A protein has these predicted regions:
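Functionally constrained cores in energy, signaling, and assembly domains
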Residues: 14, 90, 209
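Beta-strand-rich ligand-recognition modules
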Residues: 24-58, 62-79, 83, 91-185, ...
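Extended extracellular/luminal ectodomain segments enriched in beta-structured repeat modules
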Residues: 78-87, 211-219
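A short secondary-structure junction signal
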Residues: 200-205, 228-235
Length: 554
């Protein structure tokens, strides 16, 4: 349901008038600060130092124009490496009326954080403050030397949208010691500024150059964020359905999305994305105070490119291409290469021996009539295999990567296109097995599942002064990591984060008549140390009404 088409006008009108107290349906006032059930990044009990990149830095200058913070990040003298962990912390405060916005942090040309904001309620009586953190230890190689940085929230203000985001950003370096050893991390981090794909230009390219000549392992970390008609890509409909209901302004091209990756023109696999929903999405009251899963720091996927390592060590530039088939809006692509090198040889060599990765996923679409409308069902599948070898100081290392994805989206479109019921399943796994002389050297597997159900209705929409928008979302992120011997697997970590939420926003004759939401959310599994962790939160009318488990609210 392209509810956002209505909301661009609706929310503006709602904010201009504000909520008016009355008997009957609930009108939310000030809401609690945004919260999440997910565990915070763990912190070693070792000496540490913090570096401040921004201190209550406003997203906008005095004249209202967007601005970014910048400088040079230098490792603190009192906490030289090696480090057990490096953690990014960001605290954001905003009040007034504002849309959800996108933020990022570039260090040495690498996007180390990409996320979105909480949208303030618009009441203007109390600011909201939220905090998030991210483990930057995987980028340790980048952080060892002084690097330029720039970042911030891209925000735009007006006489109506007055909210300015105040940002405090720090990096904390935890020194390694006997009790907290430095973990193994990539020897080289090769990042790129993000690039945007769009209809008519569905492929973006990054050039990787000056790579090490002794690579033994290569991983590609990818974050994808949809915009415009693909902001809620999971409720995009096939073109024939959009054409059937032109007045509903439905977005077409169907709901399946991926970034098909190619290295120097050779297919390397497909990258999915979690169905992120931003804090103004569908109905804004859905996300107060519990925001959608991973709103503040978008989840990245990792594609193992080790079978291609023999090609990457030739000393020349290499093209990384990302294509978004059936693109209906814009897609921001954030890519980072994490490279391991041979510590006992200046040069390695190798070859790609098998490339059975499909250029695009196999997809099927079926549309049928149902009572009051149509059902559109889209399925897609990937079953990719790549393999190669690298000649190293430890011998010839052969690596086989298998990657699967099974996708299904069923969308009941009724009431002339103004109501949608979406049920989506999206799951897959990647395994990487490396052997020397037939014996397993390493074997890892990552499983993921992102089920989603969305009900959205603008059936009672008359105009921007008379409407009732309703929405309900049930979303889950299931992740698990396993290790093995090439034949059997055993669990290392697992988690399940779930959120069920419902919301409503209504106006009658230009006056807000209903503004309410409620939600339940849980996190169950392990934290980043592998320890059991459970946290549950219940909310109603924009306020936390119950909370159990966990170590702290954030």
């Amino acid at each position: 349901m392209r509810i956002l088409v209505f909301l661009s006008t609706v929310v503006l009108a709602w904010f201009l008038t504000g909520a008016v107290a009355s008997a009957g349906p609930v009108l939310e006032g000030d809401t609690d600060d945004p919260v999440s059930p997910a565990p915070a990044v763990s912190r070693p009990d070792s000496p540490h130092c913090s570096v401040t990149l921004a201190e209550r830095f406003p997203s906008n200058a005095a004249d209202g124009s967007p601005q970014t913070f910048s400088g040079t990040l230098t490792p603190p003298e009192s906490c030289p490496g090696p480090w057990a962990k490096v953690v990014l912390d960001e605290t954001v405060t905003v009040s007034g009326r504002q849309y959800d916005r996108i933020g990022d942090l570039l260090i040495g040309g690498t996007e180390v954080w990409w996320g979105t904001t909480a949208e303030p309620s618009g009441e203007g009586r109390r600011a909201i403050t939220y905090h998030f953190d991210k483990d930057l230890t995987p980028y340790t190689a980048l952080l060892r030397t002084p690097q330029p940085f720039t970042g911030g929230i891209g925000n735009y203000t007006s006489d109506v949208y007055t909210g300015v985001y105040a940002q405090t950003v720090t990096l904390t370096y935890y020194r390694a010691d006997h009790a907290h050893p430095a973990p193994a991390t990539a020897d080289r981090v090769v990042g790129f500024r993000h690039a945007d794909a769009a209809p008519g230009a569905a492929t973006v390219h990054f050039t990787a150059k000056d790579l090490p000549r002794n690579i033994i392992r290569a991983r590609l970390e990818v974050t994808l964020e949809g915009g415009a008609c693909d902001e809620q890509w999971f409720d995009d409909v096939p073109d024939e359905v959009a054409a059937r209901y032109p007045a509903a302004n439905l977005c077409g091209h169907g709901p399946f999305r991926e970034a098909a990756v190619a290295l120097d023109g050779a297919p390397a696999g497909g990258v999915p994305t979690f169905p992120h929903i931003y804090s103004g999405g569908i109905v804004p009251t859905l996300w107060r105070p519990v925001v959608a899963i991973d709103t503040f720091s978008l989840h990245a996927e990792t594609l193992d490119l080790t079978p291609f390592a023999g090609r990457l060590v030739d000393g020349g530039p290499h093209d990384l291409a990302f294509t978004v088939p059936d693109i209906g809006g814009s897609w921001s692509v954030v890519a980072t290469l994490l490279l391991d090198t041979d510590h006992h040889a200046a040069r390695t060599s190798g070859a790609l021996t098998q490339d059975d990765a499909a250029p695009v996923a196999a997809k099927r679409t079926k549309v049928k009539d149902i009572a009051g409308g149509v059902n559109a069902t889209v399925t897609a599948h990937r079953d990719d295999v790549t393999a190669g070898y690298v000649d190293t100081s430890a011998g010839r290392v052969r690596t086989r990567v298998e990657r699967t994805r099974d996708y299904r989206n069923s969308d009941d479109v009724t009431v002339a296109g103004l109501t949608q019921h979406v049920v989506q399943s999206d799951a897959g796994w990647q395994s990487s097995v490396s052997t020397v002389d037939g014996k397993a050297r390493s074997a890892v597997r990552h499983d993921w599942s992102y089920p989603l159900a969305v009900d959205a209705s603008a059936a009672n929409y008359v105009d921007d002064q008379n409407f009732r928008l309703t929405g309900a979302v049930d979303m889950t992120m299931r992740l698990s990591d396993l290790s093995g011997d090439g034949r059997s697997w055993w669990p290392v970590s697992a988690s399940r984060e779930w959120l069920g939420t419902s919301g409503v926003l209504a106006r009658e004759n230009g006056v807000t008549s209903e503004s309410d939401g409620s939600s339940r959310t849980t996190y169950a599994g392990t934290d980043d140390r592998g320890r059991p962790y459970w946290h549950a939160i219940t909310t109603d009318h924009g306020l936390v009404t119950a909370e159990s488990g966990g170590s702290r609210r954030r």
